[in-house]
Curated annotation (Swiss-Prot):
GO terms for cellular component: early endosome; membrane. Component of the FERRY complex (Five-subunit Endosomal Rab5 and RNA/ribosome intermediary). The FERRY complex directly interacts with mRNAs and RAB5A, and functions as a RAB5A effector involved in the localization and the distribution of specific mRNAs most likely by mediating their endosomal transport. The complex recruits mRNAs and ribosomes to early endosomes through direct mRNA-interaction. In the complex, PPP1R21 serves as a binding hub connecting all five complex subunits and mediating the binding to mRNA and early endosomes via RAB5A. GO terms for molecular function: RNA binding. Residues 84-104, 760-780 are annotated as: Disordered. Residues 95-104 have a biased composition (Low complexity). It comes from the Eukaryota. This is Protein phosphatase 1 regulatory subunit 21. The modification Phosphothreonine is found at residue 652. It is found in: Early endosome. Component of the FERRY complex, composed of five subunits: TBCK, PPP1R21, FERRY3, CRYZL1 and GATAD1, with a ratio of 1:2:1:2:4 respectively. PPP1R21 serves as a binding hub connecting all five complex subunits to mediate the binding to specific mitochondrial mRNAs. Interacts with the GTP-bound form of RAB5A (via its C-terminal region); linking the mRNP complex onto trafficking endosomes for active mRNA transport. Interacts with PPP1CA. Changing residue 75 to R: In NEDHFBA; uncertain significance. It is linked to Neurodevelopmental disorder with hypotonia, facial dysmorphism, and brain abnormalities: An autosomal recessive disorder characterized by global developmental delay, severely impaired intellectual development, hypotonia, coarse facial features, and muscle weakness, often resulting in the inability to walk or sit. Additional features include feeding difficulties, respiratory distress, scoliosis, poor visual function, and rotary nystagmus. It comes from Homo sapiens.
Length: 780
């Protein structure tokens, strides 16, 4: 672990060094560019200095010339003033002298006029040069002020960056010193490990020699004594039934019972928390009995009302898991199939938490925006919103690890056996994180409730609801702490119990092999139980062989008799059909005979021959006795019942009902009743067919609706997958854009440093030049 931490710190130092190196390259480039710009600005400043000096020299020469001209004008004016009285005195002299003085005066006037014009021109040039110099000086001063402000800003930025980089450099140097110390200690440990490895190698050689001797002895014993060896394939070894460890199973059932009790307490606390939160929304910040609450809180209350359908399955899933752990099973991750159900219920609850989290945050924001919310209450609400986010994140983390633990019972390659211990350790860490988050929620909510109780508008209902929520949060905190401590206390046992299985430590290969092993274990237990039963009295072997021959012969004769009985039944059914046929024929023939006798009797009555009548009666009696069978002769006074394939006919003898029409009426009534019965059966069958047809149509409609819903769900799933891919693309693009912006910001910072250094140098040069100019002006 120390080497891994050291390697991670080395990697972090290398990354920081690479970042600083890249920034150093950028800064070097910026410094070079800044130096080039400063050199160019220096050249420009020199050129401007030279032009300024030329202008100053011209101005000095002009002022000197102006002074000379002024002195010359004064001298000329003095000479003129002296010459005027002399001219008056000498006016009387000759005209030659006056003409001479007039010419000299004109020359002097012309010279004076030229000097005056030149002086005026020089004054104008001097004024323009002075104005231009003042304008340039004002412009340079304003630019100097702006540059000084910008330089101060850039200097502040540079100071902050230098401070930051110095801190990072000091931190890296300290880390480097620590890592050097650690590397020295690790080198010492490595030397000690080398010495230990040498000692272990010596011990290994001795053990290898000892074990090789034992192996040869064992191989010789196995080759001589063991007829077959089935330990070649690990897939088959996983099917071997392990030794039954009743203590282990009782311990696992006890642990599962404790976990079930903790989960039940946690489920009760979660139900109370969500229910009381729903009640609080109805009364604060707006009481629903007085005024309507916001649509957001209405939707949030509706979602919170459904919390039982998401929280209760957690208890049911844990109960099923507890019931699946019995004394007769082998409890490892590959056989705990019910853990997958608990993981699915936990996933559905986390989806519920994700669904209500935005509404919860918006509800807290709405409380902050209300007029009753103070600054302290607003701070507590912000802390609670952060705690709710952490709570959802902790539940998601816990569900991820539990889903990983449920993989070995469903997917063979979902989780490697070597990662079981790390996943269990992470589950314990997640439970401790859940406990910490619940402690923060309890602390912040108690502060929030205390602040709300001090409000002048706090009602008794709000105070009671806050107390209930606080008690449920405290119960959640206690339950989370109990579960975390329980899991931490049993973590070593969980990790150690993973080796419980076939061949002690080889483990199961797949859930199917674990299931087969459990079936083999049940069969082995049933076999061992059957061995405990006392043996029943058995038949001797010779007698059993004799009885077997008799049994075979009796079974053969039985099969033959069964065939004969079947043939006899078929013959009887055929004879019954023929009997019915001939009975109907006899009845029809009898009816025809009676009609014929009646016709003959009518004829005899008409002819009035008594002899013929007697003869006809004798013939009728003879024909009646010949046409009747033994059954009709015995049943003279009883009604005769005729059974056919189409129904049953009941008739009386000739002595009771001699009338032919009554007999025909009986047959007619019988067939009419049979027709009525068949029509009723037909109507019943029609009604059933209509009912079945309606049910089939309803089922077909439901099937069509189900197909449509299936298609809609597939479309939604496709859209969801597309949205997921789109969001992933957006995430990558935003990540890249942020990285580009960071690089651009670093480049911009370097360019700002360059401009800052340039402006600083320019300011220094301008200050120097302004100081030189001021000194020159003072000297002048």
């Amino acid at each position: 672990m120390a080497s891994a931490e050291l390697q991670g710190k080395y990697q972090k130092l290398a990354q920081e060094y690479s970042k600083l190196r890249a920034q150093n390259q950028v800064l070097k480039k910026g410094v070079v560019d800044e130096q080039a710009n400063s050199a160019a600005l220096k050249e420009q400043l020199k050129m401007k200095d030279q032009s300024l000096r030329k202008l100053q020299q011209e101005m000095d020469s002009l002022t000197f010339r102006n002074l000379q001209l002024a002195k010359r004008v004064e001298l000329l004016q003095d000479e003129l003033a002296l010459s005027e009285p002399r001219g008056k005195k000498n006016k009387k002299s000759g005209e030659s002298s006056s003409q001479l003085s007039q010419e000299q005066k004109s020359v002097f006037d012309e010279d004076l006029q030229k000097k005056i014009e030149e002086n005026e021109r020089l004054h104008i040039q001097f004024f323009e040069a002075d104005e231009q110099h003042k304008h340039v000086e004002a412009e340079l001063r304003s630019r100097l002020a702006t540059l000084e402000t910008e330089a101060a800003q850039h200097q502040a930025v540079v100071d902050g960056l230098t401070r930051k980089y110095m801190e990072t450099i000091e931190k890296l140097q300290n880390d480097k010193a620590k890592l050097e110390v650690k590397s020295q200690t690790l080198e010492k440990e490595a030397k000690e490990c080398r010495l230990r490895t040498e000692e272990c190698q010596l011990q290994l050689k001795t053990l290898h020699e000892d074990l090789s001797g034992r192996l040869e002895e064992s191989l010789s014993i196995i080759n001589e004594k063991v007829p077959f060896n089935d330990t070649k394939y690990s897939q088959y070894n996983a099917l071997n039934v392990p030794l039954h460890n009743r203590r282990h199973q009782l311990k696992m059932r006890d642990i599962a019972g404790q976990a079930l009790a903790f989960v039940q307490d946690l489920v009760t606390a979660l139900l109370n928390f969500h229910t009381y939160t729903e009640q609080r929304i109805q009364i604060f910040p707006v009481d629903s009995a007085i005024d309507t609450i916001s649509p957001l809180n209405q939707k949030f209350s509706q979602y919170l009302h459904e919390n039982a359908s998401y929280v209760r399955p957690l208890e049911e899933g844990m109960l099923h898991l507890f019931e699946s752990i019995t004394e007769d099973t082998v409890t490892v991750l590959e056989t705990t199939v019910k853990l997958k159900t608990f993981s699915e219920h936990l996933t559905s609850y986390i989806c519920f938490l994700r669904k209500i989290l935005p509404y919860q945050l918006k509800s807290l924001e709405e409380e902050c925006e209300s007029s009753l919310c103070t600054s302290a209450l607003r701070a507590r609400n912000l802390e609670l919103s952060q705690d709710m986010k952490k709570m959802t994140a902790v539940f998601e983390k816990l569900q991820t690890y539990i889903a990983l633990l449920a993989l070995p019972s469903t997917e063979p390659d979902g989780l490697l056996r070597t990662n079981y211990s790390s996943v269990l350790t992470n589950v314990g860490a997640a439970l401790h994180g859940f406990h910490d988050v619940m402690k923060d929620i309890s602390k912040h909510y108690s502060q929030k409730a205390a602040i709300e109780h001090e409000l002048p508008t706090a009602t008794q209902k709000l105070i009671t609801t806050n107390d209930c929520i606080l008690s449920s949060v405290v119960a959640l905190t206690n339950g989370a702490g109990k579960i975390a401590s329980f899991f931490s206390n049993n973590l070593d046992y969980f990790i150690a119990s993973l080796s419980y299985g076939p061949k002690a430590a080889s483990g199961f290969i797949s859930p199917l092999s674990a299931e087969c092993m459990l079936q083999y274990k049940k069969k082995a237990a049933a076999y061992m139980k059957s061995l405990r039963k006392p043996l029943l009295e058995s038949v001797p072997y010779e007698e059993a062989l004799a009885n077997r021959r008799i049994l075979l012969s009796s079974t053969e004769s039985r099969e033959g008799l069964a065939q004969q009985v079947q043939q006899s039944l078929e013959k009887i059914s055929k004879l019954e059909q023929e009997k019915e046929h001939w009975m109907l024929e006899a009845q029809l023939a009898k009816i025809k005979l009676e009609k014929e006798n009646q016709r003959i009797a009518d004829k005899l009555k008409n002819t009035g021959s008594a002899q013929l009548v007697g003869l006809a009666q004798e013939n009728a009696a003879v024909s009646n006795t010949a046409g009747q069978d033994e059954a009709t002769a015995k049943a003279v006074l009883e009604p005769i019942q005729s059974t056919s394939l189409i129904g049953t006919l009941t008739r009386t003898s000739d002595s009771e009902v001699p009338d032919v029409e009554s007999r025909e009426d009986l047959i007619k009534n019988h067939y009419m009743a049979r027709i009525v019965e068949l029509t009723s059966q037909l109507q019943l069958a029609d009604s059933k067919s209509v009912h079945f047809y309606a049910e089939c149509r309803a089922l077909s409609k439901r099937l069509a609706l189900a197909e449509k819903s299936k298609e809609a769900l597939t479309e939604e799933m496709k859209l969801a997958s597309q949205n997921i891919s789109r969001l992933q693309d957006e995430l990558t693009t935003t990540k890249r854009s942020y990285e580009d912006q960071l690089s651009m910001m670093s480049d911009h910072l370097c360019s700002m440093n360059e401009t800052l250094s340039k402006q600083r140098e320019e300011i220094d040069t301008l200050k120097m030049s302004s100081k030189g100019n001021s000194k020159k002006n003072k000297s002048r």
